[in-house]
């Protein structure tokens, strides 16, 4: 997909002003690894069977805020891939994701693109809870959407 096509797709999703089954707006990154993982799994398992987008730098209504001043480490394709590969996914099938940065409304947005594959649903074979917060724990065998 060319940057222009991606920019058109993301601009249209932002204009809608709401989140959907295959796109989610994130105003900023988080350091909570459970939140990072569940966001990617949910998008990878979207019920539309569509390529999915985590759009960092926009609020829940699609208003562009920018991600350039985040205090957190920004995602790269390498960092997302390494993060996912280190998790206990069933069948060793991991979501396929890439990261691209776009400039929209004079701000940078980081877009995590989660590819649509035939390997869904993605789920873990072991519980995942590095923060030890029971409210954030991802459970083995659970299908998150």
Predicted regions and their residues:
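Conserved N-terminal catalytic/coupling substructures associated with nucleotide/phosphate chemistry
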Residues: 1-145
């Amino acid at each position: 997909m060319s940057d222009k096509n991606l920019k058109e797709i993301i601009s249209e999703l932002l204009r809608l002003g709401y989140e959907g089954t295959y796109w989610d707006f994130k105003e900023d990154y988080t350091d909570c690894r459970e939140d990072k993982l569940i966001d990617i799994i949910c998008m990878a398992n979207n019920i539309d069977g569509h390529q999915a987008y985590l759009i960092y730098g926009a609020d829940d209504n699609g208003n562009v805020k920018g991600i350039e001043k985040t205090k957190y480490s920004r995602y790269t394709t390498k960092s997302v891939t390494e993060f996912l590969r280190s998790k206990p996914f069933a069948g060793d099938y991991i979501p396929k994701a890439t990261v691209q940065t776009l400039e929209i409304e004079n701000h940078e947005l980081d877009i995590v693109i989660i590819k649509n594959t035939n390997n869904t649903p993605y789920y873990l074979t072991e519980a995942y809870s590095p923060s030890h917060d029971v409210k954030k724990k991802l459970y083995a065998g659970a299908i998150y959407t």
